[in-house]
């Protein structure tokens, strides 16, 4: 490829400098004025999309807070590609996993079948942003032909590391379609999934968005928004220096209360929120609800160049439709006011369709070391891809928009 690379393993992201990592993770200029609230003439949508989750700050916060560590079953094992001068040309955020929790691409059935057949499914390699079902680059390199050659080298390096560690597999999840195609050419099995995203059709106000819906859906959303704020509930958008420790204390209480009730054990530690608030607060929007002078619920969002990413939600009081208001309607309103092109509200949830979030295909790629297991999974994925494509078309008919 013309460039001699040395590939090595880093057991912490801090073995790579923040500036060098970020130059590969987000090589475009990034639109850091997304938080300014200044009026725009068009949507924010760039070829070099800034993705907050692959930034050094976000991944470092996961490690520094011990949300990600060997004890949690997420042992950092990042792949670094350097030249003869030590300059960084490629990185892969990679982890050795001893379980399949916190991934949002489900392979529990594969693990169970392999274990029953006498194999060891764990350890496995996971290339992703832990606990974050949001699409973003995974083979981090500069754009263009030279970067493509580096990505090819990284794809092969992951297989080499898998073999050296005697791991069962490599799983690259929530990657962009072009990386999915590249990994397919390197022998990875290709998998598709479905999420629900909202797209901004150049709406000027939330009412403009409502006007695009059928009359019935429009009335339902208006009623839900009114009911959500019944009893004097107010909503507040907090960002930057407004993300004080007392605010994070309140949100963490929501996160733990809801997470413990729904999932058993939330993944993130309290320290994580302070760290991201300090290092990337200008990329965070915390949508909080207050009643009788106290915080009662909140939704944590991260802002890319053109996308608002909804991540975590929690509440200590139950109010009808408050979850929809904070996670879906307020997110749409924020995106409209900031001229963002999309809202990604996390994994799963067909109930989002009625609120304007439409089915969208997401991607993962999987290298399976055992030939027999690889053949079985390949057959399964062939059927699953057909099902996902058919489901996307079927669910699109349930969209709430007016039919001309």
Segments predicted by a language model, with ranges:
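N-acyltransferase acceptor-side catalytic subdomain
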Residues: 1-404
